[in-house]
């Protein structure tokens, strides 16, 4: 198991060495904890952090897809529908794969619906089996992805074709 400090060290490096900064942390509660208990010291994780990065100059102004629930008539202040940083979604799309780090198109779709409007272009540098592409298709967003392992790339093409067939019905 990796040292739990590593993600925080990476976040600090991203902040200090790039034009990006951490804007939010969302916690994804999976339906099942993974990995299975094989460690004497570590607990099995049922919650995973999802880190949201933005350009530093956009930290207070980046756009989301949050709904306005009310506008104060006197001050024009906007109030938004209540969103929390805790999302429940299944672990994966029940696809048999050798890829160990999969997440579900359900999680992706929920994140897209918070942060992106229809027609947005989303890039996934580690496409894996294509769950981000599926979330984009479901949410009417455009998608570009990269995957270096041909096996996972081919699985992603099959998964995307299945979603296309469902959307055509």
What residue spans do the PLM features occupy?
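Core catalytic lobe of class I
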Residues: 1-154, 162
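S-adenosyl-L-methionine
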Residues: 157-169
């Amino acid at each position: 198991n990796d040292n739990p400090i590593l993600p925080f060290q990476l976040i600090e490096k991203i902040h200090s060495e790039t034009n990006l900064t951490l804007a939010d942390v969302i916690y994804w509660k999976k339906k099942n904890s993974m990995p299975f208990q094989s460690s004497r010291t570590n607990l099995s994780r049922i919650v995973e952090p999802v880190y949201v990065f933005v350009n530093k100059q956009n930290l207070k102004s980046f756009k989301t897809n949050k709904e306005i629930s009310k506008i104060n008539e006197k001050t024009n202040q906007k109030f938004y529908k209540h969103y929390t940083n805790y999302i429940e979604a299944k672990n994966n799309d029940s696809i048999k794969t050798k890829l160990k780090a999969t997440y579900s198109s359900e999680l992706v779709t929920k994140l897209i619906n918070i942060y992106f409007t229809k027609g947005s272009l989303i890039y996934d540098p580690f496409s894996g089996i294509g769950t981000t592409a599926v979330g984009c298709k479901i949410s009417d967003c455009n998608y570009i992805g990269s995957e270096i392992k041909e096996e996972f790339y081919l699985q992603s093409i099959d998964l995307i074709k299945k979603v296309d067939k469902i959307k055509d019905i």
